[in-house]
Amino acid sequence: MEESARCSAASHIAGHILHRCDQSDASFCISLFGGLKNEPDFLPLVLPEIVAAASCAAFFQIEGNELRPRQVRSMDDLQRGAMNVWEPKAHCPSVPVSSLDIILVPGLAFTRGGLRLGRGGGFYDRLLAHPDCRARRIGIAYDLQIIDDIPCEPHDQRVHQIITETGLIDASPNG
């Protein structure tokens, strides 16, 4: 995908994320991600508005083989961490997994049924399988990342919805 098309798609994705947040309860906690070159770069477009609208905006600190949510209030609370992704700085307070209402989930590919192809580390699968995780799982992808089939293992966790540049897909195990 060319840079101009990627920027345009990221802008549309940002708009869909903000629209989804507008439909959420007044006090919600959302986790975000960003940083890898081939991922939609929506972060600068949504973070200020999400921080203003949400009761909590969180990013994940990689600790061992786990993702630990921490609250951020601006881009100043972020730094490049493991794998060059945005991570919260040490001063950012921890957020219990049970407090997360929405988790934006990256992936290399998704199916309309909510299956996700990650990068092989299992970080998001472990997070989403956490017994305290009751959050709405929303995959973030470009349209070209929506494919027909992904091999599935018992530990793989599905997303409930997928946001692309053209809108929201309600994931269904039969879809």
Report each predicted region and the residues it spans:
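N-terminal active-site beta-alpha-beta segment that forms phosphate/nucleotide-binding
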Residues: 1-98
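Conserved phosphate- and dinucleotide-binding cores of soluble alpha/beta proteins
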Residues: 65-175
